[in-house]
């Protein structure tokens, strides 16, 4: 029995030794790991080191509890070896206490080494701190800027709606104020003397008098700009056959500009024993005593289509050319049904054709200036200009039907007359060439 108990005791001791070795090895490895981690985080603050120590203590307490549980299990298995187990427990307790003592010493040594290392590192890091201060300030400013940016929170839907409403209200208020101001300005203008028509400028009237136009316009002292009807005034003025078109412009604050385009008076036609003005549109002005009639030619002998063609030819001439014409007579021949005779204001007779007379008469001012005249202004060579075919000067010879009463007593021309004839013919030839080139 003693041998068995000894063997059992030895086996139990061996098991205990193995467990102690296992626990020591595992605790050693764990301590090494924790030490390596502690050295890695040695640059951290003291709070980290205290947390590390607390963590190691927790591991140690776990191992201690584990060993106690194993010892309790073994006590339950063998009731006979109760005394031996108590001895073992005492030994294990002593071993655990020894391990606690060793562990506490190791932790104290580690803390001392960390303190020494920190003390040794502080003088080395001192010069770095001076350089790092500026860097820290820059990082702080950057962080502050970022924080300011990040502090801007996104707007919610309600806030966006409020902003939209505010903007809409501002726009509405501005529009309303502008409208109110405009209405106020308009009302002030309407009821002030500025809106009364003070000036009427009439332009383009040659045959119709200004007083007659003002009478038709009906502008009074109390007439206002906004009540004056341009449409009615234009219709009333265009009822006059002399007026071709009218344009009226209102110029603020109180001026009317009236631009008139008239129908030209191209001729005077005999009607019921009187000579009445004939307009370019073919209308006769009846009862026009107040019309200003300038030097208009007298038309005689025209009827039907020939009259219309002659009216068209005269309307195509410029007013300057028409002033040279004193009379136009329809004088057809057997071969030329469109033959006409023109008597000019400077004493010349011109024969031409209705279809071409308007184009050829535009050169008449040059013809008249090239003629040779005496001191009294009369022509040295009496004759007529034929524009029916080309342009030629034909002097009067003897008594012909085409000669006037003053020309019947004309005899042979002198040398001066022949020279004047040659000069006039040369001018007519030049004009004839120019007209052929233009055509």
UniProtKB/Swiss-Prot annotation:
Segments for region (Disordered): 1-96, 119-149, 396-439
Compartment annotation: Cell membrane
Biased composition (Basic and acidic residues): 64-76, 405-424
Signal peptide from the UniProt entry: none
Coiled coil region boundaries: none
Stretches assigned to the Cytoplasmic side: 1-173
Topological type in the membrane: Single-pass type II membrane protein
GO terms under cellular component: cell division site; plasma membrane
Family of this protein: Belongs to the FtsQ/DivIB family. DivIB subfamily.
Its job: Cell division protein that may be involved in stabilizing or promoting the assembly of the division complex.
UniProt-recorded name of the protein: Cell division protein DivIB
Species, as recorded: Staphylococcus aureus (strain NCTC 8325 / PS 47)
């Amino acid at each position: 029995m003693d041998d068995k108990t000894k063997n059992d005791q030895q086996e139990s001791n061996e098991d205990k030794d193995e467990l102690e070795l296992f626990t020591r090895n595992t605790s050693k490895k764990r301590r090494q790991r924790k030490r390596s981690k502690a050295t890695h985080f040695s640059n951290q603050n003291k709070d980290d080191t205290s947390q590390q120590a607390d963590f190691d203590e927790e591991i140690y307490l776990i191992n201690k509890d584990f060993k106690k549980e194993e010892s309790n299990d073994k006590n339950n298995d063998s009731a006979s070896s109760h005394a031996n187990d108590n001895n073992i427990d005492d030994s294990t307790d002593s071993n655990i206490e020894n391990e606690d003592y060793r562990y506490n010493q190791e932790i104290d040594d580690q803390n001392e080494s960390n303190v020494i290392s920190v003390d040794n590192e502080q003088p080395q890091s001192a010069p770095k701190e001076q350089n790092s201060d500026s860097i820290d300030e820059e990082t702080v400013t950057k962080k502050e800027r970022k924080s300011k940016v990040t502090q801007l929170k996104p707007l919610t839907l309600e806030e966006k709606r409020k902003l939209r409403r505010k903007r809409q209200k501002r726009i509405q208020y501005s529009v309303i104020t502008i409208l109110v101001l405009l209405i106020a300005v308009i009302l002030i203008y309407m009821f002030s003397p500025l809106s009364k028509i003070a000036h009427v400028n009439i332009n383009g009237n040659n045959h119709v008098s200004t007083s007659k136009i003002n009478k038709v316009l009906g502008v009074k002292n109390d007439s206002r700009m906004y009540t004056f009807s341009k449409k009615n005034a234009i219709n009333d003025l265009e009822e006059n056959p002399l007026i071709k078109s009218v344009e009226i412009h209102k110029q603020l604050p109180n001026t009317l500009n009236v631009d008139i385009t008239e129908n030209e008076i191209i001729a005077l036609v005999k009607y019921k024993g009187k000579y009445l003005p004939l307009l370019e549109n073919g209308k006769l002005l009846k009862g026009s005593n107040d019309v200003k009639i300038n030097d208009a030619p007298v038309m005689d002998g025209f009827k039907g289509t020939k009259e219309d063609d002659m009216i068209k030819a005269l309307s195509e001439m410029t007013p300057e050319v028409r002033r040279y014409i004193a009379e136009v007579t329809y004088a057809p021949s057997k071969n030329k049904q469109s033959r006409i005779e023109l008597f000019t204001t400077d004493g010349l007779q011109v024969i031409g054709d209705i279809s071409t007379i308007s184009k050829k008469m535009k050169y008449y001012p040059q013809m008249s200036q090239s003629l040779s005249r005496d001191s009294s202004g009369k022509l040295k060579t009496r004759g007529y200009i034929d524009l029916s075919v080309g342009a030629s000067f034909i002097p009067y010879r003897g008594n012909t039907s085409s000669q006037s009463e003053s020309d019947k007593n004309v005899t042979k021309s002198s040398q001066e007359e022949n020279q004047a004839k040659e000069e006039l013919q040369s001018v007519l030839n030049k004009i004839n060439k120019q007209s052929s080139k233009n055509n």
